[in-house]
Amino acid sequence: MNRRLSRLRAVQALYQMDVIDTSMEKAIESVLDEGEEASSFMSDLVSGTVTHQEELDRLYADHLQGWTVDRIGNVDRAILRMALYELYYVDDIPKNVSFNEAIELAKAFGGEDAGRFINGVLSKTMEAYKPKDK
């Protein structure tokens, strides 16, 4: 499983955990195709995002412009959380790669408007709370 697919599956698992309040293990298992195994990268993204969820929500909450964390779509929230986890806690991936992958995921799930929304929120969050250079 490559990193792009790992991110996609991680967002799907995070979405499920948010919507139907399932365990991390069940959410990961349910998004995998038959015979597919979760990569360690995917598992790390999901577990790290869940572990730091409250902190990640605080990072971007002030940059939603007229929205609250609870009001944004579940998929957008999952993408923002995972992207910020990757930007702030995963040291071996360049920031621009993590940033662009989040925008592409948003476009894949919600179209151009979703991509612009994620781009705007991530940009403002990163300006306010600069992650260490990778």
From Swiss-Prot:
Any GO BP: transcription antitermination
Disulfide linkage: none
Keywords recorded for this protein, A-Z: RNA-binding, Transcription, Transcription antitermination, Transcription regulation
Gene3D superfamilies assigned to the protein according to its UniProt record, in alphabetical order: NusB-like
GO CC terms: cytosol
CDD domains: Terminator_NusB
One GO molecular-function entry: RNA binding
UniProt cross-references to SUPFAM superfamilies, sorted A to Z: NusB-like
InterPro entries named among the record's database cross-references: NusB-like_sf (IPR035926), NusB_fam (IPR011605), NusB_RsmB_TIM44 (IPR006027)
PANTHER family per the UniProt record, alphabetical: ANTITERMINATION NUSB DOMAIN-CONTAINING PROTEIN, N UTILIZATION SUBSTANCE PROTEIN B-RELATED
UniProt record similarity statement: Belongs to the NusB family.
Functional description taken from the UniProt entry: Involved in transcription antitermination. Required for transcription of ribosomal RNA (rRNA) genes. Binds specifically to the boxA antiterminator sequence of the ribosomal RNA (rrn) operons.
Protein name per its UniProtKB record: Transcription antitermination protein NusB
Species: Halalkalibacterium halodurans (strain ATCC BAA-125 / DSM 18197 / FERM 7344 / JCM 9153 / C-125)
Organismal lineage: Bacteria, Bacillati, Bacillota, Bacilli, Bacillales
Encoding gene, per UniProt annotation: nusB
